[in-house]
Structure formats: C-alpha cells, structure tokens
Amino acid sequence: MAASMANFRTLRVLSKIFHGHFTAASAVQHHTACPRLVHTVSVFSPPSPAITESEEPDTLYQRLSVQVKGHDRAVLDSYEFFATLAAKELGLSLEKVFEPPKHIDKLTLLKSRHIFKKHRVQYEMRTHYRCIQISRITGSSARVYLEYIQRNLPEGVAMEVTKTAMEKIPEHIQKPLWDDNKPEASG
C-alpha cells in the first residue's frame, strides 16, 4: 500500500510538471541528491546547413543482391529478418528473399593415428545461405543500406554483395544500322 501511494505521488508530481503547474527547480527541490540546476532548452535551433548537390548523376542499380552465409541457422534467420526490416524502413523494393540450398562438407578421419582402420570419426560442417535481392535502387541508397547492414553483421557470418548497374545505351548502338544503309531514291 505504501509503495502504491509513493508511485501515485510521483505520478501526480510528474503530471503537474508536464501541465506547467510546477517549474523544474521546485519539482526536484525536495530531493537532496539532485543538483539544483535548471537546464534550459532553446525551442528554435539554428538552421541546418544547406544540402549539397553534386553535378554527377547518381548510379542506378537494376538489382542489388546480398548473400550471407554462416554455420548457425538461427543467427542467419535473425539477420535476414533484420536486413529485410531495414530495407522496408528505408523504402527499398524487396524483389526476392530466399534460402539457397545448404552446403555440407564431410571429413572422415581415423580415431587412432596408425591402426584400427574400422574405427573412424566423421565431422560435418554445414554452411547455410540467405539471399536478399533488392530491385531498382540508387547508388546513394545502396551505400547507406549496405553500410548499415554491414555494421550490424553478426560474428561468424560472411557477406557477398553483387550489384547490377543500369547503363545508358551508347549513341552508336541506339541508331539502327538500316537507317545508314538506305538506298537513295533515283529520280
């Protein structure tokens, strides 16, 4: 009962502070551990510097493929959830998220070094994969996304990134060859 009354008093004091009945200094006046400093926050911050624009156009990627591999399936499941959630929050269009088949590497050794060929030990390493494909992404968005997911890459997980860029067709290819070889009309 005493604990609930103390919580009720604390809530009442906090509500008075938020509604403007108390000032910040008088609200903490009864606490001896708190210093009697009042911090003021300016409402208006100075204007942020202007956004810089570069002259060169941003690179466009048709597809960004991120493949991660590791030995622990649960870690890859968690990282896949994190990477897809990050892509959705950044507004990127997820084309496909899939799990390629795992690779199993088996190693068979003798238990004893020199004798007893019938007694063997078999070791197995399983490598699990996850692939996340993002379509139609700009170069700046790709850099931000990749930096974010690479900084949060768990231990024991490797990442491979494949970018497929969209290029402008050169003018000598755009112009059809049959336009150059038109027979001249004889009059």
UniProtKB/Swiss-Prot annotation:
Pfam families according to UniProt: Ribosomal_S10 (PF00338)
Origin: domain of life: Eukaryota
GO terms for biological process, alphabetical: translation
Record-linked InterPro entries: Ribosomal_uS10 (IPR001848), Ribosomal_uS10_dom (IPR027486), Ribosomal_uS10_dom_sf (IPR036838), Ribosomal_uS10m (IPR040055)
The keyword Ribonucleoprotein is annotated on this UniProt entry: yes
Cross-referenced HAMAP family: Ribosomal_uS10 (MF_00508)
Protein name according to UniProt: Small ribosomal subunit protein uS10m
Organism of provenance: Danio rerio (Zebrafish)
Species classification: Eukaryota, Metazoa, Chordata, Craniata, Vertebrata
